[in-house]
């Protein structure tokens, strides 16, 4: 058995051998993932040290020394002087190791009353708050661009499709307004999820509290949480569950991203030729000189698969009884991969939406006579013919339904709220304006 092992194992007992291969398996890439959470962990350690001083477990001088060293560690991590690597089991170990190295016994006091369990809970919670804030902002931005395009192009006719078959006359404005409302909903969902997870787990330790009068309300305020997560068992049950909720909010946005990317992929084909993409959103072929491929849109479309995979991984991890289990370590990789990929794709969408160009002549040419048949059936019903009879009449004359009709007259006639003649843009703008920017502490990076 190879007993060579990493130093700085917080849980190691003297005289107990550790198999290096087992330790490598246990740690996996955990410390590398902790680079995402490290500054949040330092922030939480600052609040915890203050809480310890408030109950007399640290002197004022000890607190000052700890806060100074935590700030130094944060600065060194930001500027690259301190590298969080595999000499440490995880980010928590790195923080305690640094404090002990610099402050001796004072540094060894930092872990009083806390566990790595509530450490990662609070660091992840702070990280998720910032990611959900970013998600909500991106959803608002996407909706904003879509609303602008809806207003500008509400009178531009285009085919409306069902089953990928031409159905009725629609408008570019209606297409845009549909995405605007969808991303307003996505912004609300992100904000609601942020409100759900905005609670402080620090001080719940390993899931059963500690025999100390920890000032948890103080750390709640210091860390910018809206409320305390009261029960330690509930705090442990929330690990994975809150990450899952956050990924579901992200997935709501990337699901719409996938569908709008699908539309754009179709509309850029020679067979449709409805839109022209900015050149930087396409690539070429390594063998076919004539090709311009919408690779950016295709990878946007694929993004939802990454988010869904992360969500599925966490769902499977949560087949556990109550309390902490090491399985949950794997939830970190899932949320990091899901959010990093999802947000990166969503960040590209506002500029794309503002710059793509419709081709009005092709849109109009794709509107065929049969697309007026529904209008004809409803007009006959208005004249007193039972709708089912009017439907049959219109079906027989669908090929000639365009007589005395234009795309513009069809659009003007569609007056039901939300339809082409009444997009209700003011209603959507009012909803958009209710999307207050979610509050979160600034990203420490």
From Swiss-Prot:
Coiled coil: none annotated. It catalyses: 2-(N(omega)-L-arginino)succinate = fumarate + L-arginine. One of its GO terms (molecular function) is argininosuccinate lyase activity. One of its GO terms (cellular component) is cytosol. GO terms for biological process: arginine biosynthetic process via ornithine; L-arginine biosynthetic process. Its EC number is 4.3.2.1. It is found in: Cytoplasm. InterPro entries: Argininosuccinate_lyase, Fumarase/histidase_N, Fumarate_lyase_CS, Fumarate_lyase_fam, Fumarate_lyase_N, L-Aspartase-like. Pathway: Amino-acid biosynthesis; L-arginine biosynthesis; L-arginine from L-ornithine and carbamoyl phosphate: step 3/3. It holds the Pfam family Lyase_1. Keywords: Amino-acid biosynthesis, Arginine biosynthesis, Cytoplasm, Lyase. PANTHER family: ARGININOSUCCINATE LYASE. Belongs to the lyase 1 family. Argininosuccinate lyase subfamily. HAMAP family: Arg_succ_lyase (MF_00006). This is Argininosuccinate lyase. It comes from Xylella fastidiosa (strain Temecula1 / ATCC 700964).
């Amino acid at each position: 058995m190879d007993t060579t092992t990493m130093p700085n194992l917080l849980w190691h007992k003297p005289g107990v051998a550790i198999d290096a291969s087992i330790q490598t398996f246990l740690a996996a890439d955990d410390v590398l993932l902790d680079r995402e959470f490290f500054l949040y962990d330092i922030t939480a350690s600052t609040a915890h040290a203050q809480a310890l001083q408030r109950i007399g477990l640290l002197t004022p001088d000890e607190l000052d020394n700890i806060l100074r060293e935590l700030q130094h560690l944060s600065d060194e991590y930001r500027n690259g002087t301190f590298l969080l690597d595999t000499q440490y089991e995880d980010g928590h170990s790195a923080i305690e190791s640094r404090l002990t190295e610099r402050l001796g016994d004072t540094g060894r006091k930092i872990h009083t009353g806390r566990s790595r369990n509530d450490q990662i809970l609070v660091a992840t919670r702070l990280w998720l708050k910032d990611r959900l804030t970013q998600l909500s902002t991106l959803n608002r931005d996407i909706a904003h661009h879509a609303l602008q395009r809806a207003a500008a192009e509400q009178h531009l006719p285009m085919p409306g499709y069902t089953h990928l078959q031409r159905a009725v006359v629609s408008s570019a404005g209606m297409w845009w307004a549909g995405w605007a409302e969808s991303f307003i909903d996505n912004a609300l969902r992100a904000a609601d999820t942020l409100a759900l997870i905005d609670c402080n787990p620090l001080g719940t330790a390993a899931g059963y509290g500690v025999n100390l009068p920890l000032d948890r309300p103080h750390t709640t305020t210091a860390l910018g949480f809206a409320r305390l997560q009261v029960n330690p068992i509930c705090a442990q049950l929330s690990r994975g569950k809150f990450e899952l909720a956050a990924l579901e909010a992200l997935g709501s946005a990337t699901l719409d991203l996938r569908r709008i990317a699908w539309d754009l992929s179709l509309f850029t084909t020679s067979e449709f030729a409805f839109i022209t993409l900015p050149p930087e959103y396409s690539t070429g072929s390594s063998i076919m000189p004539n090709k311009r491929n919408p690779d950016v849109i295709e990878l946007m479309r694929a993004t939802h698969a990454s988010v869904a995979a992360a969500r599925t991984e966490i769902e499977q991890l949560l087949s556990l009884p109550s309390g902490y289990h090491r399985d949950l370590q794997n939830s970190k990789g899932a949320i990091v991969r899901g959010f990093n990929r999802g947000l990166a794709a969503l960040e590209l969408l506002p500029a794309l939406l503002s710059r793509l160009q419709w081709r009005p002549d092709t849109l109009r040419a794709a509107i065929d006579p049969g697309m007026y048949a529904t209008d004809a059936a409803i007009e006959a019903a208005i004249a007193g013919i039972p709708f089912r009879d009017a439907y049959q009449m219109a079906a027989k004359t669908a090929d000639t339904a365009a007589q005395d009709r234009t795309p513009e007259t069809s659009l003007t006639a569609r007056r039901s709220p939300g339809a082409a003649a009444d997009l209700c843009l003011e209603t959507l703008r009012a909803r958009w304006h209710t999307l207050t920017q979610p509050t979160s502490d600034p990203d420490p990076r």
